Curated annotation (Swiss-Prot):
Family: Belongs to the anthranilate phosphoribosyltransferase family.
UniProt lineage: Archaea, Methanobacteriati, Methanobacteriota, Methanomada group, Methanobacteria
Organism of this sequence: Methanothermobacter thermautotrophicus (strain ATCC 29096 / DSM 1053 / JCM 10044 / NBRC 100330 / Delta H)
Residue sites binding anthranilate 1 per the record: 82, 113
Subunit structure: Homodimer.
InterPro entries in the cross-refs: Anthranilate_Pribosyl_Tfrase, Glycosyl_Trfase_fam3, Glycosyl_Trfase_fam3_N_dom, Glycosyl_Trfase_fam3_N_dom_sf, Nuc_phospho_transferase
Gene behind the chain: trpD
UniProt GO cellular component terms: cytosol
Cofactor: Mg(2+)
Catalytic activity from the UniProt record: N-(5-phospho-beta-D-ribosyl)anthranilate + diphosphate = 5-phospho-alpha-D-ribose 1-diphosphate + anthranilate
Protein name: Anthranilate phosphoribosyltransferase
Length: 352
């Protein structure tokens, strides 16, 4: 039996080929493996350590089997999605950054889920703001075309995610599925800003994106002021480890907040609230451009730095600081808040 051979190889610390990993994910998605077998596979892979080829095969299978959000010029579409699971429970930075970048003219296909480590994930915050997050592929494509932004709720697009959800909860440790979410954009976005929970994943995940045909990307992990791993985002409180992917070449760099055009902030200022209502207020303050207190300024600056990177990747700015400056002008003009209001109205009128 194929499963028995694969689990035996993994338990012997032998790596699967990309094709074998693809086949294994197909078995999971087709419901051919029960929870015990899925748990065994995920545990064995975590103990061995997943390779670039294995992650590529898993991601390719999930992409091939999920509904496709078909948009013209998908190579110019940007996805902003992190793995979650980092060591600090920050407010929802990537969703604020996506909204700001979209208001600046970037076509953003935001792919996300509910909270992993924070108290409010991208789906949670947009739903609380009034967005209809349960759009099918056709509706998401219309939203991207008409509004300039769409949200694709991962469980609606990836049956494998739903299939293994209970197993992942019972295992209680990170598995390859923590990495796969951001790698499986239903819009096949050609441009990506992808945050990872572990700095050791920065280079390998960039290699996976290259294997999957991503045109250009930044894979990032943010550190705190004491150089401790902290954020699956660009950091404004310490260094950011970045893998730049462009023209099939990968370059690793370590950047500081001024390299993004922002001042060094305080990590504690970025902490999420304890309720969805509190997190919605933090999110709205950022889109309003509020910086009356040091806490508000830190939250705004990190959103601007991440939005600026999206603007830079999309080719709407020549440098990262220019991207951040464009993001700041966008927020101060009120355009980000206006786009959210339009996004809410549009998605509520769409029938999935």
């Amino acid at each position: 039996m194929k499963f028995r051979r694969m689990i035996s190889e993994i338990m012997d610390f032998r790596n699967l080929s990309e094709d074998e990993a693809y086949s294994l994910m197909e078995m999971i998605m087709a419901g051919e493996l029960d929870d015990i077998k899925i748990a065994a596979i995920l545990t064995a892979l975590a103990m061995k350590g997943e390779t670039v080829d294995e992650i590529t095969g898993f991601a390719r299978a999930m992409r091939d089997r999920s509904p496709r959000v078909r948009v013209s010029g998908s190579h110019e579409v940007v996805d902003s999605c992190g793995t979650g699971g980092d060591s600090f429970r920050s407010y929802n930075i990537s969703t604020a950054a996506a909204m700001i970048a979209a208001a600046a003219g970037v076509r953003v296909a935001k792919h996300g889920n509910r909270a992993v480590t924070g108290s409010c994930g991208g789906a949670d915050i947009l739903e609380a703001a009034g967005v209809n997050i349960e759009l099918d592929a056709a509706a998401a494509a219309r939203s991207l075309s008409d509004v300039g932004i769409s949200f694709m709720f991962a469980p609606l697009f990836h049956r494998a995610t739903a299939r293994v959800a209970a197993v992942r909860r019972s295992l209680g440790f990170k598995t390859v599925f923590n990495i796969l979410g951001p790698l499986t954009s239903p819009a096949a976005a050609g441009i990506q800003l992808l945050g990872v929970f572990d700095p050791q994943l920065v280079g390998p995940v960039a290699e996976v994106l290259r294997n999957l045909g991503t045109r250009c990307a930044m894979v990032v992990h943010g550190f705190d002021a004491n150089l401790n791993p902290a954020l699956d985002e660009i950091s404004t409180v310490g260094p950011t480890l970045v893998a730049f992917l462009e023209d099939d070449e990968i370059r690793i760099d370590r950047l500081m907040p001024p390299d993004f055009g922002v001042e060094v902030g305080e990590l504690e200022h970025l902490r999420a609230g304890s309720t969805t209502a509190e997190n919605l207020e933090l999110f709205m303050d950022v889109l309003r451009g509020r910086e009356d207190t040091p806490e508000q300024k830190s939250r705004l600056d990190i959103a601007l730095a991440n939005a600026g990177a999206l603007i830079y990747l999309a080719g709407l700015a020549d440098t990262l600081p220019e991207g951040t400056e464009t993001a700041k002008r966008t927020v101060k003009s009120g355009a980000a808040l206006e786009l959210l209001e339009e996004f809410v109205s549009y998605t509520r009128n769409l029938q999935s």
